[in-house]
Each structure stands twice: as C-alpha cells, then as structure tokens.
UniProtKB/Swiss-Prot annotation:
Free-text comment on the cofactor: Binds 2 copper ions per subunit.
Proregion residues excised on maturation: 1-51
Protein purpose: This is a copper-containing oxidase that functions in the formation of pigments such as melanins and other polyphenolic compounds. Catalyzes the rate-limiting conversions of tyrosine to DOPA, DOPA to DOPA-quinone and possibly 5,6 dihydroxyindole to indole-5'6 quinone.
Active site: E351
Disulfide links within the chain: C583-C627, C585-C634
EC number(s) on file: 1.14.18.1
The name this protein goes by in its record: Phenoloxidase subunit 2
Record text on subunit structure and interactions: Heterodimer.
Gene3D superfamilies for this protein: Di-copper center containing domain from catechol oxidase, Hemocyanin, C-terminal domain, Hemocyanin, N-terminal domain
Species the sequence originates in: Bombyx mori (Silk moth)
C-alpha cells in the first residue's frame, strides 16, 4: 500500500481526469465511496472505480469525512475554466480552498488526504492544483510531499498545442515498454524574425524561466486568509528584487540581440504595438489562448463573472497616490496616521499583496495592469472570452508586454531608491578594511581566458502526467533551449587583518549600452545581474577563492527544473528533494549566462568582498539545511532573508560620487573585462531518458 505521502503526490497526476481512474506509474486507484462522487458519476461511479481497481497494482482507501468541507465560492468556477490569481473572484475562491486545506489539524494526514481528494473531485483542476501546492508548502506535516513539476502536470501551458495530438497518438499506438521517439518542438513556432521581438522568444518562452516565475509565486503568494502564508520576511522587497533582476536579465538579452532596452509602459492610454500570438491550447478549457493584435489599447474593465470592475481613471489615481508616497517618503494608513515608506512596504503596495498598508488609497496597480492587458480583446465579457497569457503566473513571461509593464513597475521602485529618503551608501558601508582584491577572472575548461561560452541544447520533458485519458508510459517532447559551458570564478585576495568571514558578491553587466558607448553609473547599476553570493572565510595573508558556476545562490540545478519525480520515489535524498518545494523558485541553471553573440559580446565581471559584520543575520546561515540553492531569490524557509543588506546591494541605489563603474571600485572590489560568446551549435542533453532516441 502506498504511504500517505505517496498518495498525496498522486493527487497531482492527470489533473483533468476524474479521480475514479488509475493514477501514477503503478496504476494506483483511490477507493472512492459515495462521499467522493460528483453528480456525473452518482449512478455508476463506484462500479467504474471498482472496475479500474481490478487491474490496479495498489488500492488507496479514503477515510470518510465526518463533516464535508463547504466550498460556497470555489464551486462557482467551472471545471473547464481557466484560473488566474489576478482576478478578484478567483482570489476569493483560492482563499476559501486554501483555508480549508490549511485548517485540517496537523498530523491528521488521512483526514487531509480525504479533504484534498474531495476538493480535487469537486473543484476546478487549476484552482485545486494551485491551492494544493501552496498548502503542501506551508503545512508543517507535508514538507516531505513533493510538489510535482507544473510543466509535466499542465504541459499545455508551456508547449506548442500541436504537440498534444501527436502525444496522444504515441500513447495510444506504441506500447509503454517500446522506446518512443520524442516529439520535436520547433524553435520558431510562435512567430518569425519579421517580428523583432521574436528574437527573444528563446528566452521569453523558455520552460525553466516560466517555471521559475510560477514557482516563485507559489512560495510568495500575495493573498491568503492566513496572513502568515503571505507575511514572509522582506516579502515586498523580494518582489521588487526578483522582478528587477528579470528586467535586467531581459535587457541584457536584448542587447545581445541588437535590440534596445525595453521601453516602460507609462502612458496607459496609448496603443500597444507589441502583438503576441501564443500558439497554446488549454487542455482544461479545450480552447486556444487569445492572441493580442498590434495597436490594441487598455479599456475599462467590467467583467462581473470575475468580479473585475476597474477603470483606467482609478489606476491613474492610485499611481498619483503612490507617487505622492515616494515624494514625501511617507505612507498614509487607513486610520489617517502615517509611517515612513520603505522598499518592503512599497513592494506590498504595488503588487499589491494582503500586506498593503492601505489598499483603498494605493490600489492594486501591478495586478490590475496584468488584467487590463489580458482582457483588451473582451473588456466587458461580451464575447465570453478568457484572459490572455499575461494573466497566468505560468505563462505571463511569454508575452513581450510583460517586460514593458514590469519595466514601469521597476521604474517606480527606482524612483523610491533615487529619492531624498534613501541615501547613497557611504564609503564605510561599502569598504571592507584590510581586504584587497588583487585580481578576478573566469575560467572555462578548455576555453579562452575570461570568456564564457553559450550554446543550444536539446532536452526532453515527459508529457504523460498531464496527458489525460491516454495510456500510461512516458511520452517525451524535445525542445531547444540556451545553455552555457560551466566555468569557475577565481578571486585573489589579500587580507592584512586576522582571519574573518566575508560575503562574496558577484555580478556581471554589459560593458556598453545600445549605442555602443560606455555606461554612466546611474544606468549601468540597473543592468548588473547577480550571478552568485556566498559567505567564505578569509585567512590572514593571501587567499585564492575558487567558486564553480553551478554553486550559484541564484539558481536551481537543471535536474530540479526538469526533475523526474517518479524516479525519486525510493531516492535516499527524498527529504532534500522535497525541500525543493520551497527553494525551487530559483533561476534555472541553464539560463544563468546571457546568450552573448557569435563574435563575442563585451561584459564586465564585478566582484565585491563586503564586510560580514554589516551583512550577518543572527541565525543559522542555512548551511545545515538540505536546500540552500537560490536563497538570493527565494530566501530560506522559516528563516530571515540570509543577508542584512538591501537586496541588490551595492547596486540597488545611486552613488553620491561615482559616474562610472570604474569610479565605484574600492580596494575590496574587483572589475574585469570578460567576453560572452555564443557557440551556435546544438547538442543533445546527456540527461535525456535513455529510451528517447
């Protein structure tokens, strides 16, 4: 019999299929009672369930609940509808369901299994999957339950819609024990290079990048009845920093592709020239995602079904109030009092999360911006159209307009950082007395000195867990993505003092702007992308620090982005892999390095060894934890953010004196010119399953 953790994991399997059918690779069947049957299966559900059970390798009994949970709001979402947290009505539904799942008494796991099974049977599969994932991450008794890879459970959110007809044919015709040829996904399936934004499709539509965004919002939801789920340490600041780094990385990629930095969307009444045709179909709704034509505009939203009533006038009023808060350095509270504005508060105001200090006054600018864009084609629900990809956390980064909108959001944060209420760093805050960086470099095995190399890779993703109503057995899709040759940082440091700890902060930045001229510091600081941050010990005298690119505190390993959960069932690292539920929101390892150019694009490597006395947090540093990957973007579970400095330090604010990055350098910092060169070759991923040929 499957243990309760394995049974909970099976609730992710084939989300659009009813629970009466077998789940998982072992053909496991939940033994349902009348309590768990919907009206559709009231007459023959038990008989069907028993028939499936005759062929099952294991049967999972479900405990009858003494009191059935009530879902007065959540049941209003049809099972074949799309779900979006940006919609007020859907937020209410999620809060109701999440509250029920969190309220099951701790360690009553059979009750939890039955409650979750009842919710899965009766509610929309996407709504259930989101709330179930958040609950598993935030309940103390389910930390060993692995949240399944969202791209494998809902593959239609990530892959060309044409794939699924071929996938069903493969599943139906080829026996599971026969090697199956992967279905090839073309690199250019959403547009051609006649559309200049398509040059960035490899980045915007990357499965790992979109999983990163979805997973980050699972770990940091902006709404819940239980505020402890939302109120994590420096949550609003992390919303700023994660998205600021996304925009900086996107702008680096634009320069690599001979495009200008993204233009912020600040005039909310002008036409939007960026079109997007996603070429995705939803397996939940059996409809295609709506495209956006060039030249469409935001319009007032009046959609009763989603509880979405908001006007552009309201958005502009909220913007004026936020601008006033930045200009005065104060936030007005509902009771009329004020308090100082800081970056964490501003993040919660702008998103806005349940922690917003005054939602009536400051509104929900970020979230409604997504909704305005997602409903331009049907703002009044006249044509019964669903939202566009920008309103789904798993698909939003595919849309070119996502970056224009977030360039505006980031600009608001930057105005705060540049205001009179955020002072530039003093020399004593930046320096590390007695520490001198003599040289910094990067080294790629077999490569040129101070040169990073990127290339294309073919990787497989298993579709079978999300391929409803088809035979078991793996069905692979093969897609092309960017990758890089692993490298090491080498830092030579002289420490004239005694042995001490230091935080090593590593960034890279393009050397020239889009006009091919050197940057001014006020612009270049916003283009600095964090590559790594770690604490190390400096001995007295000379120190040679070597750090592998794969150890980055920004990223999660490739295996965790595209992890095969079925293979982890008996893995001795099960607890460690389950902790991925939390830290899995990190940046994908294969996208750590910008693409560069075939000729080689000039970048600069910046390394800083900061004063640990000003960095340290009085808690365990996380090294005793099984999962410390991606702490820069994800924090540490149930702990404070592992760095006392402002996120993005030392580039999060202007300098009082430096006009260039070279001017900014102090003895405890190093700057080195490097080159990023694209090797325009495509290689198969050695991790691809052996049966894919």
């Amino acid at each position: 019999m499957a243990d309760v953790f394995e049974s909970l994991e099976l609730l992710f399997d084939r989300p659009n299929e009813p629970l009466i059918t077998p789940k998982g690779e072992n053909n496991s069947v939940f033994q349902l009672t009348e309590q768990f049957l919907t009206e559709d299966y009231a007459n023959n559900g038990i008989e069907l369930n028993n028939r499936f059970g005759d062929d099952a390798s294991e049967k999972i009994p479900l405990k009858n609940l003494s009191k059935l949970p009530e879902f007065k709001i959540a049941t209003q979402l049809p099972k074949d509808a799309e779900f979006s947290l940006f919609l007020p009505k859907h937020q209410e539904m999620a809060n109701e369901l999440l509250g029920v799942l969190m309220d099951v008494p701790e360690n009553e796991l059979q009750d939890l299994l039955s409650t979750c099974a009842f919710a899965r049977v009766n509610l929309n599969p996407q709504l259930f999957n989101y709330c179930y994932s958040v609950a598993l991450m935030h309940r103390r008794d389910t930390r060993k339950v692995r949240v399944k890879n969202f791209a494998e459970v809902f593959p239609s959110k990530f892959l060309d819609s044409q794939v699924f007809t071929q996938a069903r044919e493969t599943a139906a015709v080829i026996p599971p024990d026969v090697p199956r040829i992967p279905i090839i996904i073309p690199r250019d399936y959403t547009a051609t290079d006649l559309e200049e934004e398509h040059r960035l499709a490899y980045w915007r539509e990357d499965i790992g990048i979109n999983l990163h965004h979805y997973h980050w919002h699972l770990v940091y939801p902006f709404t819940a009845n239980d505020l402890s789920i939302v109120a994590k340490d420096r949550r609003g600041e992390l919303f700023f920093y994660m998205h600021q780094q996304v925009i900086a990385r996107f702008n680096c990629e634009r320069l690599c592709n001979s495009l200008k930095r993204v233009k912020k969307f600040s005039n909310w009444r002008e036409p939007i020239p960026e079109a997007y045709f996603p070429k995705l179909d939803s397996l939940t709704s059996s409809r295609g995602w709506p495209p956006r034509q060039s030249g469409m505009q935001w319009q007032d939203l009046n959609r009763a079904a989603e509880g979405l009533f908001v006007t552009i006038d309201e958005m502009e009023r909220w913007r004026r109030n936020v601008e006033e808060a930045i200009a005065t350095g104060t936030v007005r509270l509902p009771n009329g009092q004020t308090r100082p504005l800081d970056i964490d508060t501003l993040g919660n105001m702008l998103e806005s999360s349940a922690l917003s200090p005054n939602r009536e006054l400051y509104g929900s600018i970020h979230n409604n911006g997504h909704s305005f864009t997602a409903y331009m084609h049907d703002p009044e629900h006249r044509y019964l159209e669903q939202f566009g990809v920008i309103a789904d956390e798993a698909t939003t980064m595919r849309d070119p307009f996502f970056y224009r909108w977030h360039a505006y959001i980031d600009d608001v944060f930057q105005k705060h950082k540049e205001s009179a209420y955020v002072r530039p760093y003093t020399r004593s805050e930046l320096e590390n007395p007695g520490v001198q960086v003599r040289s910094v470099s990067v080294e790629t095995p077999g490569g040129q000195p101070n040169t990073l190399n990127t290339f294309w890779m073919l990787s497989d993703v298993n579709l079978s867990r999300g391929l409803d109503f088809s035979d078991n057995g793996p069905v692979y899709a093969r897609f092309t993505h960017l990758n890089y040759r692993h490298f090491s940082y080498r830092i030579n440091v002289n420490n004239t003092g005694s042995s001490r700890r230091t935080t090593v902060r590593i960034f890279i930045t393009p050397k020239f702007d889009e006009r091919n001229v050197p940057w001014i510091f006020s612009d270049q600081r916003k283009m600095c992308i964090e590559m790594d941050r770690f604490v190390t010990v400096l001995n007295a005298g000379e120190n040679n620090i070597v750090r592998q690119s794969t150890e980055s505190s920004i990223t999660i390993p490739f295996e965790q982005t595209f992890r095969d959960l079925s293979a982890q069932g008996n893995d001795p690292r099960r607890d460690e892999l389950a902790t991925f539920n939390y830290c899995g929101c990190g940046w994908p390892q294969h996208m750590l390095v910008p693409k560069g150019t075939e000729a080689g694009m000039p970048f600069q490597l910046f390394v800083m060894l900061s004063n640990y006395d000003l960095d340290r947090i009085d808690q365990d540093d996380g090294k005793q934890l099984t999962c410390v990957e991606a702490s820069s973007f994800c924090g540490l579970k149930d702990k404070k953010y592992p760095d006392r400095r402002a996120m993005g330090f030392p580039f999060d604010r202007p300098s009082s004196s430096a006009t260039s990055l070279q001017d900014f350098i102090l003895p405890n910092m190093g700057l080195q010119d490097i080159t990023i060169q694209l090797q325009n070759v495509t290689e198969p991923n050695p991790r691809n399953p052996p049966m894919s040929v």
